[in-house]
């Protein structure tokens, strides 16, 4: 486990000065490094992020349907987007990781970076209040909220299903072919089977849902050629 570096610089990047540095310390601590890790803060931050982004989208798009709002929110709060924010903050430089995670490059892993962003949101909430969280999250997401649109936010599984239904084809079948790793860091291999392709298409990701989306995206590319 490495010591946390240059916390004042991180606070300036986040736009928030902690009253209780212990909250930030815990938010940056992965379960591989200590029993006092960031998973409970991540749980809290995930809920706060969801309500802040939901509220912002609700007011920004008064004519959008519930489905459009849900898809835009899913795009904005997904692990990939959170990891992008973490990279902008150079969050990997500050994470506390156990020896195994350090050796395997955990400070670059999308899931660890995304979880840390949510944990920091939870830490800020406990250190201040929901309004501070709201303003900070909106600041972090300002450029992303400016460009998000109700169109083209459907996930690959939805797009694939709609495409197949349009041409009266059977719906895809998803099957978990393989899982590996510990419970908290599993890798899922999922097969997507469609009538028009002779072989199943494989998606690999850190969750079953993400692996299914990856496989669906590949199938779409293949059948539209």
Swiss-Prot record:
Keyword Ribonucleoprotein: no
UniProt-listed SMART domains: DSRM, RIBOc
EC numbers on record: 3.1.26.3
Binding-site residues for Mg(2+), renumbered to this chain: 42, 115, 118
GO biological process terms on file: mRNA processing; regulation of gene expression; rRNA processing; tRNA processing
Residues covered by the DRBM domain: 155-225
Needed cofactors: Mg(2+)
Keyword flag RNA-binding: yes
Alphabetical UniProt keywords: Cytoplasm, Endonuclease, Hydrolase, Magnesium, Metal-binding, mRNA processing, Nuclease, RNA-binding, rRNA processing, rRNA-binding, tRNA processing
Enzyme class: hydrolase
RNase III domain location: 7-129
Function noted in UniProt: Digests double-stranded RNA. Involved in the processing of primary rRNA transcript to yield the immediate precursors to the large and small rRNAs (23S and 16S). Processes some mRNAs, and tRNAs when they are encoded in the rRNA operon. Processes pre-crRNA and tracrRNA of type II CRISPR loci if present in the organism.
Name by which UniProt lists this protein: Ribonuclease 3
Gene source species: Shewanella pealeana (strain ATCC 700345 / ANG-SQ1)
């Amino acid at each position: 486990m490495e010591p946390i570096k240059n916390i004042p610089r991180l606070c300036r990047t986040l736009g928030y000065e902690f009253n209780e540095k212990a909250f930030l310390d815990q938010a940056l601590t992965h379960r591989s490094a200590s029993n006092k890790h960031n998973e409970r803060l991540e749980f809290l931050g995930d809920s706060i992020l969801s309500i802040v982004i939901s509220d912002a989208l609700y007011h920004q798009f008064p004519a959008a349907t519930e489905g459009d709002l849900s898809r835009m929110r899913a795009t904005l709060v997904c692990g990939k987007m959170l990891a992008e924010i973490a990279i902008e903050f150079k969050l990997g430089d500050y994470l506390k990781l156990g020896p195994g995670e350090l050796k395997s490059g955990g400070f670059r892993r999308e899931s660890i970076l995304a979880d840390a962003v949510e944990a920091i949101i939870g830490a800020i909430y406990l250190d201040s209040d929901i309004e501070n969280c709201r303003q900070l999250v909106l600041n972090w997401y300002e450029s992303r909220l400016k460009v998000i649109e109700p169109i083209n936010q459907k996930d690959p599984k939805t797009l694939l299903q709609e495409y197949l239904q349009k041409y009266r084809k059977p719906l895809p079948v998803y099957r978990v072919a393989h899982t590996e790793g510990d419970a908290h860091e599993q890798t899922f291999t999922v097969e997507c089977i469609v009538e028009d392709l002779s072989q199943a298409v494989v998606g690999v990701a850190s969750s079953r849902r993400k692996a299914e989306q990856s496989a669906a995206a590949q199938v779409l590319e293949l059948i539209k050629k």
